[in-house]
Amino acid sequence: MVKVLVLYVFHKFNDSVDHFFKHCIFRDENIDFLIIANDINFKFNLVNLPEYVMTMVRKNIGRDFGGWSEGLLKDQLYEKYDKFIFANSTIMGPFIKDNTRWTDYYINGLQDNIKLFGSTINNAYHSHVQTYIFSLDKEALAYLIEIGKFSITKYLRSAREAQNNEILISKDITDKGWNIGCLLKCYQGIDFTFKNKAKKDYGDKLHTDIMYEKYRNVLWNEYEVVFIKGNRIKVTSSLIR
């Protein structure tokens, strides 16, 4: 069976983090959860996580990627797994109408030549998977570790560096000849390497950052993308499974 590691990172405990703890963690013999607190003073014993959940407390160095990197590379934990889901504390969900596990959406997206998959793709600059939640297979992760996109020796220091890293990991994937993908139906079947059809030839079919309220129920809905950025868009709790 495929072994999956879910890495969730936060730096401040708030309602979104509490929601993830209560609604997004479940027991499965093939899925492990690692919760990473980018807060050296955080006390996990106060939040009563299930005993099967792994936890890590660290200094807030390197932002989300710093936390994910330490989770992956400390004791080479990533070597035990086949596929990986990364999430940060801006996410809110999951929005699912049936009994499908939310992790399945991100793992099942890693098929054919797609090595990096998320809820949404932003086509500003280089087309890139937005990293509030995304998945990688082991081959792609190993490559990104090799070229330093996940590192515990060179940390991202600024918001600009973090934004650039989000863009560049997608570029690294497509430059390698692999594809990226997301849950947005309007992007199904698109080859984001643009080898056979140039990006400009898609015209207005490729959008920039659409994870905003004004695009909700116009270009996407929460059940299509499973998780939204809760720091931008507010929804009623009754919509969440």
Short names for language-model regions:
Residues 1-241:
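ER/Golgi luminal nucleotide-sugar-dependent glycosyltransferases, focusing on the catalytic module
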